Swiss-Prot record:
<comment type="subunit">
    <text>Dimer of dimers.</text>
</comment>
<feature type="modified residue" description="Cysteine sulfenic acid (-SOH)">
    <location>
        <position position="283"/>
    </location>
</feature>
<feature type="binding site">
    <location>
        <position position="251"/>
    </location>
    <ligand>
        <name>NAD(+)</name>
    </ligand>
</feature>
<keyword id="KW-0520">NAD</keyword>
<dbReference type="InterPro" id="IPR015590">
    <property type="entry name" value="Aldehyde_DH_dom"/>
</dbReference>
<feature type="active site" description="Charge relay system">
    <location>
        <position position="161"/>
    </location>
</feature>
<keyword id="KW-0521">NADP</keyword>
<keyword id="KW-0560">Oxidoreductase</keyword>
<comment type="function">
    <text>Involved in the biosynthesis of the osmoprotectant glycine betaine. Catalyzes the irreversible oxidation of betaine aldehyde to the corresponding acid.</text>
</comment>
<dbReference type="GO" id="GO:0046872">
    <property type="term" value="F:metal ion binding"/>
</dbReference>
<dbReference type="InterPro" id="IPR016163">
    <property type="entry name" value="Ald_DH_C"/>
</dbReference>
<feature type="active site" description="Charge relay system">
    <location>
        <position position="461"/>
    </location>
</feature>
<feature type="binding site">
    <location>
        <position position="243"/>
    </location>
    <ligand>
        <name>K(+) 2</name>
    </ligand>
</feature>
<feature type="active site" description="Proton acceptor">
    <location>
        <position position="249"/>
    </location>
</feature>
<feature type="binding site">
    <location>
        <position position="457"/>
    </location>
    <ligand>
        <name>K(+) 2</name>
    </ligand>
</feature>
<feature type="binding site" description="covalent">
    <location>
        <position position="283"/>
    </location>
    <ligand>
        <name>NAD(+)</name>
    </ligand>
</feature>
<dbReference type="InterPro" id="IPR011264">
    <property type="entry name" value="BADH"/>
</dbReference>
Length: 487
């Protein structure tokens, strides 16, 4: 097969197989072709991963932070050296255009490893003077952390979660999405090549039952999930029973607000980036595009013109700008939302169908879609679609659009396009969302935290904040005089 790995799992520094597990076929979304055959983790595989992690974690945490950081930075170098190879693997696994995976996947993973490897030696506790005595705090590792990944950015998510965890001295067990299991194994090999001690980064494959087993395992100190809100609720409930630490990066239905003084081409570019990149399969996408009534017609006319020029096709052709959705089930789901949008009265401005592509008739492709005349109560304006479907809504004034933007159970992201930066800051200050942009959209440098409000999540990925989520604070009080006791 095109992308068959050495084995399904990576445990204790080596590939491991157990064919007693449930078969896990890997499908190339552009052709519906099976490119690899793996097996879901058995209880024995899961226990082996925990045994390896437990054995390695203590010595790793005892290393100087600068020594841990050096290995992470070397891993980043290896990923960059192998970027093209890894990008091709990610394109096979996800169907995303190679044009995109070359710059957004392994490259972002390398950025995370480099960032956390560089800052960990300066991530220290506090010193508090208390007169004749003093106190200090220590940031200590949690132990064994679990990451559960999504299928839109497999290697990026694996690195975004494991880099801060490992930097802090934890061991890590990662379960990729069953749809995209391959690149996490490649990341494990890169860690090994960089000198990461065996057992610190383990990959176990599987379906939801494997994820549940990891969450519920007695040795799991923390769970970090990237996934849907329903999955997040289940994992929160499971983790809560044992008071485990959690980070939840969940779904969104984010607003992107375009005022009438905005640079039109820039705003349209931001809206397209925030709806069509990765074939619309991005949790932070600004799928509710609020456009001021004064520029609505010009905005939609130019948006449709540019959207129709998006090149859909062979993901390995570097001129291709959009590949397929991840699966037939996901395409069917997106098409059902398009049907619902039309039925509820939205105007289909462009797209909405399945393109005919020579040689890719079995692929899970869909046209980038724009709806106009969308109202706040329509299903396509309320629910996360996770596909290339943009809803354009009209607004008249600032207070109105702020209220409408906030009228959602989600709060992952938001964007504002305006020439008036004072207004931009004011509006963003009123929006209930965790990750926001002014005159940009969906740019996520690893140096800054990423995460949401409300039903969109708990905790943060990236930035110094991520290190806090993979550590616990120990307070030490030091008495320099005699104990003052009433006894």
């Amino acid at each position: 097969m095109k992308a068959q790995p050495k084995a399904s799992h990576f445990i204790g520094g080596a590939f491991v197989e157990d064919k007693a597990g449930k078969p896990l076929p890997v499908i190339y979304p552009a052709t519906d072709e099976e490119i690899a055959s793996l097996y879901s983790a058995t209880p024995g595989i899961i226990e082996a991963a925990y045994a390896a992690a437990l054995k390695a974690q203590g010595e790793w945490a005892a290393l100087k932070p600068v020594e841990r950081g050096r290995i992470l930075r070397r891993t980043a170098e290896i990923l960059r050296e192998k970027n093209r190879k890894l990008s091709k693997l990610e394109t096979l696994d996800t169907g995303k255009a190679l044009q995109e995976t070359l710059v957004a996947d392994a490259a972002s993973a390398a950025d995370a490893l480099e960032f956390f490897g560089g800052i960990i030696s300066g991530f220290n506790g506090e010193f508090v003077e208390l007169g004749g005595s003093f106190a200090y705090t220590r940031r200590e590792a949690l132990g064994i952390c679990v990451g559960i990944g999504a299928w839109n950015y497999p290697i990026q998510i694996a690195a975004w979660k494991s880099a801060p965890a490992l930097a802090m001295g934890n061991a890590f067990i990662f379960k990729p999405s069953e749809n995209t299991p391959l690149s996490a194994l490649a990341l494990a090999e890169a860690y090994k090549e960089a000198g990461l001690p065996d057992g610190l980064f383990n990959v176990v494959q599987g379906y939801g039952d494997v994820g549940a087993a990891l969450v519920n395992h007695r040795l799991t100190a923390k769970v970090s999930l990237t996934g849907s809100v329903p999955t997040g609720r289940r994992i929160m409930a499971q983790a809560g029973e044992q008071l485990k630490h959690v980070t939840m990066e969940l779904g969104g239905k984010s607003p992107l607000i375009v005022f009438d003084d905005a640079d039109l081409e820039s705003a349209i570019g931001g809206a397209m980036l925030g709806n069509f990149y990765s074939t619309g399969q991005v949790c932070s996408n600004g799928t509710r595009v609020f456009v001021h009534k004064n520029i609505r017609e010009r905005f939609i006319e130019r948006l449709v013109e540019r959207t129709r020029k998006i090149r859909i096709g062979d993901p390995f052709d570097e001129a291709t700008q959009m590949g397929p959705l991840i699966s037939a089930a996901q395409r069917d789901k997106v098409l059902s939302y398009i049907k619902k949008g039309k039925a509820e009265g939205a105007t289909l401005a462009c797209g909405g169908g399945v393109p005919k592509l020579q040689g890719f008739d079995k692929g899970f492709f869909i046209e980038p879609t724009v709806f106009a005349d969308v109202t706040d109560t329509m299903t396509i304006a309320r629910e996360e679609i996770f596909g290339p479907v943009m809803s354009v809504l009209e607004f008249s004034d600032e207070d109105e659009v702020i209220a409408r933007a906030n009228d959602s159970e989600f709060g992952l992201a938001a964007g504002v396009f305006t020439a008036d930066l004072s207004r931009g800051h004011h509006v963003i200050g009123q929006i209930k969302a965790g990750t926001c942009w002014i005159n940009a959209y969906n740019l996520t440098p690893v140096e800054v935290p990423f995460g949401g409000y409300k039903q969109s999540g708990i905790g943060r990925e990236n930035g110094i904040a991520a290190l806090a989520h993979y550590s616990q604070i120990k307070t030490v009080y030091v008495e320099m005089g005699k104990v003052d006791s009433p006894y």
